[in-house]
From Swiss-Prot:
Protein role: Catalyzes 2 different reactions between oxygen and the acireductone 1,2-dihydroxy-3-keto-5-methylthiopentene (DHK-MTPene) depending upon the metal bound in the active site. Fe-containing acireductone dioxygenase (Fe-ARD) produces formate and 2-keto-4-methylthiobutyrate (KMTB), the alpha-ketoacid precursor of methionine in the methionine recycle pathway. Ni-containing acireductone dioxygenase (Ni-ARD) produces methylthiopropionate, carbon monoxide and formate, and does not lie on the methionine recycle pathway.
Residues given in the record as Fe(2+) binding sites: 91, 93, 97, 136
Cofactor (UniProt): Fe(2+); Ni(2+)
Positions that bind Ni(2+): 91, 93, 97, 136
PANTHER family (alphabetical): ACIREDUCTONE DIOXYGENASE (PTHR23418:SF0)
Protein known as: Acireductone dioxygenase
Chain's gene name: mtnD
Gene Ontology BP annotations: L-methionine salvage from methylthioadenosine; L-methionine salvage from S-adenosylmethionine
TM ranges: none
EC number(s) on file: 1.13.11.54, 1.13.11.53
């Protein structure tokens, strides 16, 4: 179940419409799409993109996105902990970070000006667009299992720009 956790009030939201409204009020786009494809752990990037082409292609065309790829994070990945550490550091991007979760789950953390830090646990079917310049970090968890389609205007825009704030250190105990 998709959840949104507010660290200051310790309130957890579970209603998709309420989560969408909360995120929208902070400039973050959130939708839920169907995920009918039955994907194996070994499904290739081409297989995953083909399985969702009927919704992905029109979405990309309507929003000016040029390319997509698949991130497949699971416990069998070599050096997962080192990879996880890169995602766990607060950063921004020079373009929107758009992810469509097709399997598993992951935790997006947000540190927005004027708002207490909060996180969104995204799962299969969730589409989230983190606006460019938004301070955030991502956690696939200590035992990862997530397949997500990454959607780009320009793949160079995905390069993380680390803030160096280390605010994420305060929240390391909260994970999937």
């Amino acid at each position: 179940m998709t959840t949104l956790y507010q660290t200051e009030s310790k309130q957890t939201l579970t209603d998709p419409a309420t989560i969408k409204d909360f995120l929208k009020s902070h400039g973050i786009w959130f939708e839920q799409w169907e995920t009918p494809a039955q994907l194996t752990q070994e499904a290739s990037q081409a297989d995953i993109l083909a399985a969702y082409a009927d919704v992905l292609d029109p979405f990309m065309a309507a929003n000016g996105y040029q390319s997509a790829d698949v991130v497949n994070i699971h416990s069998g990945i070599e050096n997962y902990q080192a990879i996880r550490e890169k995602f766990l550091a607060e950063h921004t991007h020079s373009e929107d970070e758009v992810r469509f979760f097709v399997a598993g789950q992951g935790l997006f953390w947000f540190n927005l000006d004027g708002t207490a830090v909060f996180n969104v646990c995204c799962e299969a079917g969730d589409l989230i667009s983190v606006p460019q310049g938004t301070k955030h970090w991502f956690d696939a968890g200590p035992v990862p299992n997530v397949k997500a389609i990454r959607i780009f205007s320009d793949t160079a825009g995905w390069t993380p720009h680390y803030t160096g704030s280390q605010v994420e250190q305060q929240y390391r105990a909260i994970t999937l």
